[in-house]
């Protein structure tokens, strides 16, 4: 199985998963890049997976379905183009992989991640929940939901690969360095991120550089407390403070 990012819009990635001469597309913001990829690689679209109902994630799903009407569109009931409604725990297959749907709200009140388990490990297509060195903004969800989604991700094996839908890594790492200026892993990752695409990323890597997965680290908590000017008594409070600080960070 081969997984390829296809650039779309300004900073979106549409993830294309190939098995044989069939492919899945994840979060098609627009149809043209997907269609070009399929034609160039002589592939048939087998499935479309949508994580949440924002135009830059579902915008191309309806057009793709019209072009490949035997190709199901998976998504929750608020995904207009969905032909196969999913909920937490829904399972299906693609190629030799097993797909499990997780509810990972926070960015939006209903947000799906797709966990693809293959012989080489777990691949998580996480939309706008987790970014490398960062997390999604809270729109219609809650910070408590987003924190819980991160805690669930953090219980996966450390070699799990995450496939976010945006390349925000360099900006996120600059904020992470603001929180942990002495973290050598962040400095190394930032130098690399300025030169090349960074995704996917392992959970092991994110545990070293993502402040939103490091809320129990004393240096992170202390820095957040210093910046917000108050005591933070739990991982959730540190997480919420970091999200507010990131919102204001330039």
From Swiss-Prot:
Region forming the signal peptide: none
Enzyme Commission number, as recorded: 3.1.2.6
Binding site for Zn(2+) 2: 56-57, 128, 166
Note on how the cofactor is bound: Binds 2 Zn(2+) ions per subunit.
EC primary class: hydrolase
UniProt pathway annotation: Secondary metabolite metabolism; methylglyoxal degradation; (R)-lactate from methylglyoxal: step 2/2
Cofactor(s) needed by this chain: Zn(2+)
Keyword Hydrolase recorded: yes
Catalytic activity: an S-(2-hydroxyacyl)glutathione + H2O = a 2-hydroxy carboxylate + glutathione + H(+)
Function of the molecule: Thiolesterase that catalyzes the hydrolysis of S-D-lactoyl-glutathione to form glutathione and D-lactic acid.
Gene3D superfamilies: Ribonuclease Z/Hydroxyacylglutathione hydrolase-like (3.60.15.10)
Subunit comment: Monomer.
Gene from which this protein is expressed: gloB
An example Gene Ontology molecular-function term: hydroxyacylglutathione hydrolase activity
PANTHER family xrefs: HYDROXYACYLGLUTATHIONE HYDROLASE, HYDROXYACYLGLUTATHIONE HYDROLASE GLOB
The entry's keywords: Hydrolase, Metal-binding, Zinc
Recorded family membership: Belongs to the metallo-beta-lactamase superfamily. Glyoxalase II family.
Gene Ontology terms: biological process: methylglyoxal catabolic process to D-lactate via S-lactoyl-glutathione
Binding residue positions for Zn(2+) 1: 52, 54, 107, 128
Protein name, per record: Hydroxyacylglutathione hydrolase
Any single Pfam family the record assigns to this protein: Lactamase_B
